[in-house]
């Protein structure tokens, strides 16, 4: 590509018109259901502790902060939205920019648009149904199918992910020609994620969206543990045509348990030589004050627009990708 061409948008103008229509349809969906649209900060003094997420960091120098105040671009609006929920705002949604300092490719740009929403009094299954309704309305696709994480592994890899040990997981990885990665990996959840990405994802959601629910409890993140089966978390993801679209939880409301999970993440980060991340004490205070029982989900809008257009890469639906920003 010549330098003179980089001033032009990444996406064709007709694609941007379709993008605007998708955004309008999303807003209509929530307005019709009485869900409040909110805006929360793009920067925070705290960030995520997840070992797989890498936030952008910046520094504010101004009145009262002559030595500088460390700030992080938000990887998701989740923490601020939960503070609004604890303050009594009721059901909310947000369309916003999120930022992740990681790979760039067909489905990734460091700056992207996220739809996130929270539903008080919804369990995981009721929110799954609402995500399905949204996808049908925006993409005009068939109703989704649902599989538990365990069912998906048993169907496509003939192994039980909830009981298999690391040796058994490595044996399955060998059948997928992944021994060069798996044989040196000591973290069981990383092995599971490798097998899910390479051995399960390619086979699901081909003709209609597929929800995968009840991830292992060790991958709960900010989700509650299932009261029926303590081996699994009330967490789900949805896939369609080779793309991960959304990640949702029946949200954890226990501040003490959430702090323990943040601290555990930071221990894992230390073991991998990654920097320790500041824990969001404002979120923990909101949980202490009382987060209502709720379920929430984050959905990648750019990826939905890709599917609506049949686009092959995220660059076809974003005005300016990072290499042209």
UniProtKB/Swiss-Prot annotation:
Q: Which UniProt keywords apply?
A: ATP-binding, Ligase, Nucleotide-binding
EC number(s) recorded for this UniProt protein: 6.3.2.-
Family matches, as InterPro entries? Aa-tRNA-synt_II (IPR004364), aa-tRNA-synth_II (IPR006195), aa-tRNA-synth_II/BPL/LPL (IPR045864), EpmA (IPR004525), Lys-tRNA-synth_II_C (IPR018149)
Residues reported to bind ATP: 100-102, 109, 244-245, 300
A single GO BP annotation from the record? Answer: lysyl-tRNA aminoacylation
The top EC class, named as a word, is ligase
Annotated GO CC locations: cytosol
Q: Give residues annotated as binding substrate.
A: 76-78, 118, 251
Reactions catalysed, semicolon-separated, are: D-beta-lysine + L-lysyl-[protein] + ATP = N(6)-((3R)-3,6-diaminohexanoyl)-L-lysyl-[protein] + AMP + diphosphate + H(+)
Any one Gene Ontology MF annotation carried by this entry is: lysine-tRNA ligase activity
How does the record describe its quaternary structure? Answer: Homodimer.
Give the family this protein belongs to, as stated in its UniProt record.
Belongs to the class-II aminoacyl-tRNA synthetase family. EpmA subfamily.
> What is the annotated role of this protein in its UniProt record?
With EpmB is involved in the beta-lysylation step of the post-translational modification of translation elongation factor P (EF-P). Catalyzes the ATP-dependent activation of (R)-beta-lysine produced by EpmB, forming a lysyl-adenylate, from which the beta-lysyl moiety is then transferred to the epsilon-amino group of a conserved specific lysine residue in EF-P.
Protein known as: Elongation factor P--(R)-beta-lysine ligase
Q: Which organism is it from?
A: Klebsiella pneumoniae (strain 342)
């Amino acid at each position: 590509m010549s330098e003179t061409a980089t001033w032009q948008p990444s996406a064709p103008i007709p694609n941007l018109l379709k993008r605007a229509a998708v955004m309008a349809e999303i807003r209509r969906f929530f307005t019709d259901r009485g869900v409040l649209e909110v805006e929360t900060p793009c920067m925070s003094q705290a960030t995520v502790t997840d070992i797989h997420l890498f936030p952008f960091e910046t520094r504010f120098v101004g009145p009262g902060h002559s030595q500088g105040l460390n700030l992080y671009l938000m990887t998701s609006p989740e923490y601020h939205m939960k503070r609004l929920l604890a303050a009594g705002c009721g059901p909310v949604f947000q369309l916003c920019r999120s930022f992740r300092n990681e790979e760039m490719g067909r489905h990734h740009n460091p700056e992207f648009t996220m739809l996130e929403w929270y539903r008080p009094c919804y369990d995981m299954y009721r929110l799954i149904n609402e995500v399905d309704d949204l996808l049908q309305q925006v993409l005009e696709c068939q109703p989704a199918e649902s599989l538990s994480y365990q069912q998906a592994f048993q169907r496509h890899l003939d192994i039980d992910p909830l009981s298999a040990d690391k040796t058994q997981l490595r044996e399955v990885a060998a059948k997928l020609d992944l021994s060069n990665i798996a044989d040196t990996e000591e973290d069981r959840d990383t092995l599971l994620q490798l097998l899910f990405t390479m051995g399960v994802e390619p086979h699901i959601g081909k003709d209609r969206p597929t929800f995968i629910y009840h991830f292992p409890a060790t991958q709960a993140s900010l989700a509650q543990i299932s009261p029926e089966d303590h081996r699994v978390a009330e967490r789900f993801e949805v896939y369609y045509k080779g793309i991960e679209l959304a990640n949702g939880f029946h949200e954890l409301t226990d501040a003490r348990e959430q702090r323990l999970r943040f601290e555990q993440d930071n221990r894992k980060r230390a073991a991998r030589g990654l920097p320790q991340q500041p824990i969001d004490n404002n979120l923990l205070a909101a949980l202490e004050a009382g987060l209502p029982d709720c379920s929430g989900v984050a959905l990648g809008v750019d990826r939905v627009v890709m599917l609506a257009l049949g686009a092959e890469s995220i660059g076809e639906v974003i005005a300016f990708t990072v290499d042209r920003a």
